[in-house]
Amino acid sequence: MAKGYWIGRVDVTDGEGYKGYIARNGIAFAKYGARFLVRGGPFEAPEGTARSRNVVIEFPDYESALACYRSPEYQEALAHRLPHSQGEIVIIEGYDGPQPGEG
């Protein structure tokens, strides 16, 4: 079964206010088995417009990734992010098919 992922790109406009989101999002992430694969760090954006923070979060499956976003726990955390940031989140199913160089 393919995993699910959140790909998030965010510009924080109020770091102090954003702390409310950080304090709350872990409740939903733990409930739905989330695991950070990328959480900030140095990056280069060779194409398109960059955001200052980039995150990739892995979930056990696509349905869990969707359920986490739609959960009351995450929606409560999100209410603390939206006034203090601008960004995008894409929720996507992983790929389990053949890879380059495989027979």
Which role does the model predict for each range below?
Residues 75-91:
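C-terminal structural segments of small proteins and small subunits
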Residues 1-53, 60-70, 93-103:
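Short S/T/G/P-rich N-terminal loop/turn motif that feeds into the first structured element of a domain
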